[in-house]
Amino acid sequence: MTVPTASRRLRIVKTTAAFVAGSTLLAGCQVISPRQTDEMYDAGDGVSVNVGPLQLRNVVLVSDKVGAAGVVSAAVGNPTAEDIALSVTGAGEGNSAQVTIPKHSTINLSVDGSKVTLAKVDAEPGSMAQLTFSSAQAGNSPVGVPVVPATGYYADLTP
């Protein structure tokens, strides 16, 4: 059995102390740096809104010009044990649509055959349009929604 010499023991102590000091310094950086996952934000083009138990994410209104029809694109989650009817209303008389969100599911309004089309959009692409989402369980939830042109990955979303 070999016994460490004094210089070897000193090197081990110094290495351990350097490791502990470095770990403490690196861990301390996290204290003053906020974690991005602590902040809620919309990472896509659209906005998020909750209508009672329904969770709408990445909501946008696809339309090429003011006065033209528009398609509402969004992912809608229903975590409840019952189907929920969701109404979407835009500006103007009779400018609304309704879709049923099945229980325990998430659907994409623009992809899953549940296309929601409004007859008239009162805002130009690049601006915000006021839409009201409503359900019997939650009442009305007005929200400003970005209007995007039917180009790029929205090219297939024409009324």
Stretch-by-stretch model annotation:
Residues 30-33:
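Bacterial signal peptide processing site
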Residues 69, 82-89, 143-145:
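Short, hydrophobic/aromatic beta-strand segments
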Residues 91-120:
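Intrinsically disordered, low-complexity Pro/Gly/Ser/Thr-rich segments with frequent PxxP/GP/PP motifs
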Residues 24-28:
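C-terminal motif of bacterial Sec signal peptides marking the signal peptidase cleavage site
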Residues 36-49, 140-142, 147-159:
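Extracytoplasmic/periplasmic copper-protein system
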Residues 74-80:
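Asparagine-centered strand-capping/turn motif at beta-strand->loop junctions
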